[in-house]
A protein has these predicted regions:
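N-terminal capping/small domains of soluble enzymes
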Residues: 1-79, 331
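N-terminal small/glycine-rich loop or linker at the start of catalytic domains
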Residues: 1-19, 96-107, 127-141, 186-195
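A mid-to-C-terminal "edge-of-domain" accessory segment
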Residues: 3-4, 10, 251-372
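Conserved, mostly hydrophobic/aromatic
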Residues: 14, 34, 95, 136, ...
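Glycine-rich, proline-tolerant flexible connector loops at the mouths of alpha/beta enzymes
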Residues: 39-63, 97-110, 139-141, 166-177, ...
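Active-site beta->alpha loop and helix N-cap motifs at the rims of alpha/beta catalytic domains
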Residues: 41-48, 67-152
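Alpha-helix-loop-beta-strand connector modules within alpha/beta enzyme cores
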Residues: 51-78, 116-131, 180-198, 243-249
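Catalytic alpha/beta core domains of metabolic enzymes, predominantly
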Residues: 170-289
Length: 372
């Protein structure tokens, strides 16, 4: 299967989440996790924003080089020469530029003037940096006219010969079928020298699914983050996206098998977020890592063939079935005679219906004794 590049934007997207700021030490720790997990590219910040951003990114880049890390360090800026000049100060070789062709932007600027700005910026970078990798993000694929999107893609791919064309659903309003249609069209224009990236926001809860669909439609770079942290509702989740793609046979350097390190990574980002904003991102309902992913209530699920398995929890209410009750009794080491199992299940259901809640362990013990 195709090789997929993992572009972790936890740092820069995280700094756009509800009052969150990452210190240099926190960025370094995040980069260490990314390296340990096989991330290909880390977006360490936004250099034109402030002198401190340039300083932090430069230090992150040099530290990664000093340690002989494989991870590549990048920064984001507008597709303007003045922004790119600040990026050059960091010493980076990975340049992420963004521009917009939405109706609102075109009410202020012509397509030709935006093209000229893009050309000037790309030529400037190439005059200052030997063999840079240049990515351009077109904001955004959901709000830009399809014919204009194709025209922009052809200009960037054929005329400017950029390395990566990123297709972001910045508004987070697209569904997988819409992403598929647009990414497939643009990917068909890419040729062999320009890779297509996919970057999806989560306003309608579709970010991870849309990112996966972008790959299925022809993209080869996922732009994701730890816990899906990012602007507004965030972006695609790095672990869930990566695991899903690997399970489908795609080739990723991302080591989703290192679940313990991923958990540490997520717990670290969550702790920083909670400390600085009072918001917890890692909770019982977090996919894969949340406790709820290992709980069962309905009888069919109690067979143990669904979900993540590992350390499981069982809750008994009117929806429980024989297999789930069996697993519950085994888990809590409650002895019973198998011939009374059906009666035990019926009594548990009756008790739950009567109380309008799940039954407690003590109540289950009483039911088992009474049934025997």
């Amino acid at each position: 299967m195709r090789k997929i590049i993992v572009f972790d934007q936890t740092i820069r997207e995280g700094m756009q989440y509800r009052g969150l700021m990452f210190s240099y030490a926190e960025r370094l720790k995040i980069m260490e996790f990314q390296q340990a997990l096989g991330v290909d590219i880390s977006q360490a910040g936004y250099p034109p924003a402030h002198e401190s951003e340039i300083r932090h990114i430069k230090k992150i880049y040099h530290e990664a080089s000093r340690r002989n890390y494989n991870i590549r360090i990048s920064g984001l800026c507008r597709a303007l020469v003045k922004d790119a000049s600040r990026m050059v100060e960091t010493g980076l070789e990975e340049f992420n530029l963004h521009t917009s062709f939405t109706a609102e932007m075109l009410s202020r600027q012509s397509v030709e003037s935006i093209f000229n700005s893009l050309k000037d910026t790309v030529l400037f970078i190439r005059s200052k940096v030997e063999k840079p990798s240049i990515e351009v993000s077109l904001l955004d694929i959901g709000k830009t006219d399809m014919e204009l999107l194709k025209k922009c893609a052809v200009f960037l791919i054929n005329n400017l010969k950029i390395n990566i064309l990123s297709l972001p659903d910045t508004s987070g309003l697209m569904s997988p079928n819409q992403v598929c249609k647009r990414v497939k069209i643009i990917s068909s224009l890419a040729g062999k020298n320009t890779q297509i990236g996919i970057h999806c926001h989560n306003d309608l809860g579709m970010a991870t699914a849309n990112t996966i669909m972008g790959i299925l439609a022809g993209a080869s770079i996922i732009e994701v983050s730890a816990l899906g942290i990012g602007e507004r509702n965030g972006i695609g989740d790095i672990f869930i996206t990566g695991k899903n793609l690997k399970d489908q046979g795609f080739d990723l350097n991302l080591e989703t098998e290192k679940e313990d390190i991923f958990r540490e990574y997520y717990e670290f980002v969550d702790s920083v977020c909670y400390q600085k904003t009072g918001i917890k991102l890692l909770n019982d309902n977090t996919p894969f890592f949340g406790n709820s992913s290992m709980t069962h209530v309905a009888g069919t699920h109690g067979i143990g063939q669904f979900g993540l398995a590992a350390d499981q929890e069982f809750y008994l209410n009117v929806l429980c079935g024989k297999h789930l009750v069996e697993n519950y009794l085994k888990l809590h080491k409650i002895g019973y005679e198998k011939k009374y199992l059906q009666e035990i299940v019926a009594r548990i259901k009756d008790k739950s219906a009567e109380a309008d809640r799940c039954v407690t362990k003590e109540e289950v013990k009483e039911i088992v004794v009474e049934s025997g």
